[in-house]
Amino acid sequence: MLHRGLIEWYEQNHRILPWRETEDPYKIWISEIILQQTRVVQGMEYYHRFIHRFPDIHSLSSASEDEVLLYWQGLGYYSRARNLHKAAQLMRDHEMFKLNNNNINNVATESTPSVAKGKTSELLNSEQIFSALKSMPGVGDYTAGAIASFAFDLPYPALDGNVYRVLSRLYDCEIAFDTTEGKKHFRKLAEELLDREHPRLFNSAIMELGALVCLPTSPMCSECPLNTWCEALAHNTVELLPVRKPRPKVRDRYLEYTIYITPERTTLIHQRKGNDIWKHLWEFVETTSVDFKNDNIDNLRPNQHPRAPKGSNSTQHYTTLHHSTQPQAISLTHVLSHQKLHARFVIKNVSELPDIPDTLVVSLNDLDNYAFSRLTLKAIEFLAQR
């Protein structure tokens, strides 16, 4: 009854999303990685852009990392893009990605090889597919389960934030879902609840229920097809769930960059190295070991600034010195999950660019060809209006 009620609700109320209109493992994989840290509405544009440029695993694997990062620009959590690229290079010839909408139903459910429709073909069984998916960089249990379910209709649960919320309320579970114990517990619940006859449809339905009805705040319990079985609703604890582990304190970090500009409108950029934030993204010349939090900027006056992107979690304040012969300064604040960045971009007009190691001379008109962090993109947006 629970399965049927949920699936019937889904069939009447689900949104039309491009990754639901395909069973191509590659496209479903791309969508799942994008949606790991991005809302559906925000991720839609990026998905279309990414798939348009990299329509299959071969086009992605043969691209440079710089180009992949460029097409990921704005999504954040850039390790996702780097892992996508690595995985594409590792898996480009894997049998799994040779399956498409025309032969997707030929996946073997037993450990023995099967014969494709009209063809002799060594096919993969469900365990081989799940194992292959989990071996890919950036793919864990949830993402592997989601791809196996949505692309191959295999009986694996798909757990995202929406599903954790539905399960925590359905079972009135007070275990923090983002702990090691919680992940194991909720995976067990999801496996027990899964409709093994219709895993693709069931996983889509429970995720959609969390997105449209079982909301983080003001959930629409009266419209929920699972309200008869919901223990949190019966115990009046819906608003208290799900439980998260305490989040680490966000620390302040101060950054300063110099934007050199010649009369020919050229500048210097360099690519970030190491394992810090924005690995392999480009940026202007960073002034190291600078802490300007106590600087006196009373001599700076506000300048007209571009509107922040809709939905941005950044605040921004553009400033410029009174005397036009002096450098300009752009002050920006950008919030990451674990850091609050206070950045200042000092614009210096120079007759020629300084000789700085590991930098690249580029035209300001060509900055669109390089991948930058969202913070640096705001500074570039200001430059475009000068």
List the predicted regions and their residue ranges.
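Catalytic cores of DNA base-excision repair glycosylases
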Residues: R4-G5, W9-M220, L226-H235, E239-L240, ...
